[in-house]
């Protein structure tokens, strides 16, 4: 579970670890930024939407919730589309959907229409871009894959820092309708990123074996892998509490009497630390002595994040919350950089498209349950400390599930023979005895000349399909 898989892609092409892969990395950086930052960035338009439609804040908050639910919950659908049509066509269609949803939303006359356009259509478009971009990134990088994943993950905080001020500027100058229209045009850049996702093509070589059978559209055999099951369970529990502190930290500061401007600056601190934490975590995970133990590093990052939540629950002033945001940003960045690297190390490239879709589907339920459950607890107790303790306990539990499960269930699997030994034994088994005196050409002629025997078809390399 903790070992790194040598990525030779579904076509058998060795990952180039550079070259055009840097263009793919840039595209993945942009797509990751749009996918994770966009649901948060649209929140700057909520006040105008409340005034326009005469609704409450909880009604507008459903826009971001639906966006995230589509991003996570459509994982299996994305997996099926990628396995059927390939990454680039799916991303091109997704880019059009993402743009179309925001453009259509600018003409909406009710909040329900905004849910359907911005939430469902744009959310589906972002999902059709996010998952294929990660698949392509992990096909292009093998040795440098941890670093590549870390750099791509940095797109989330970078775009969040850029899109939120941009959204505010657009709202002030053009209103929410004009802002949605311009953001819809901006999302067409997803199609540009899709064009960068050039598939790796293998050239047919003489003497090569028969073509590989087509893969399943959704490979459920990943559930037979104990490592994948442990990862999926741990990730789902982690997501229950992972996104709760960023949602409530600003309100927590205001409850302590901190001015609105200083309270909002806490998210800027968190995002700034996150920008540097993700590439740094990817670099560390790619070190030769660390990479085989990437699953333990991922467990540590979750444990660190849970401890930060528990420490943040004791903050009694603005300085304490600043310290919390610094340590939370470090641990949050580590989790973001390592989560898909560890999943790739568990299942390999050939099953990654199905595995990531299934994991995102399981996480979708947790995303919808986590922040609302924190809000319910806050409504019942009116104490932010309990919310942070709950979030920290959930993330700590997930780290222990992954750590103990990997140590006791995965490490004790029987060791497989070394590749060199296995190859030598295979050669010995297939090598004919020295004194057999059998002419191999006669045997080959016999197999070709007698395709049927006793009513049964003998499948030779020439007759097999």
Curated annotation (Swiss-Prot):
Cytoplasmic-side segments: 2-17, 83-84, 131-149, 201-227, 286-294, 339-351, 406-465
Biological process annotations from GO: lactate transmembrane transport; monocarboxylic acid transport; plasma membrane lactate transport; pyruvate catabolic process; pyruvate transmembrane transport
Effect noted on mutating residue 432 to A: Does not affect basolateral plasma membrane localization. Intracellular accumulation. Affects subcellular localization leading to apical localization
Region (Disordered): 419-438
Subcellular compartments: Cell membrane; Basolateral cell membrane
Designated name of the protein: Monocarboxylate transporter 4
Mutation effect (residue 425 to A): Affects subcellular localization leading to apical localization. Affects subcellular localization leading to apical localization
Main location: membrane
Catalytic activity: (S)-lactate(in) + H(+)(in) = (S)-lactate(out) + H(+)(out); pyruvate(out) + H(+)(out) = pyruvate(in) + H(+)(in)
GO annotation, cellular component aspect: apical plasma membrane; basolateral plasma membrane; lateral plasma membrane; membrane; nuclear membrane; plasma membrane
Membrane disposition: Multi-pass membrane protein
Residue numbers bearing the Phosphoserine modification: 436, 464
Record bears the keyword Lipid biosynthesis: no
Organism: Homo sapiens (Human)
Keyword entries, A-Z: Cell membrane, Membrane, Phosphoprotein, Symport, Transmembrane, Transmembrane helix, Transport
UniProt subunit comment: Interacts with BSG; interaction mediates SLC16A3 targeting to the plasma membrane.
SUPFAM superfamilies recorded: MFS general substrate transporter
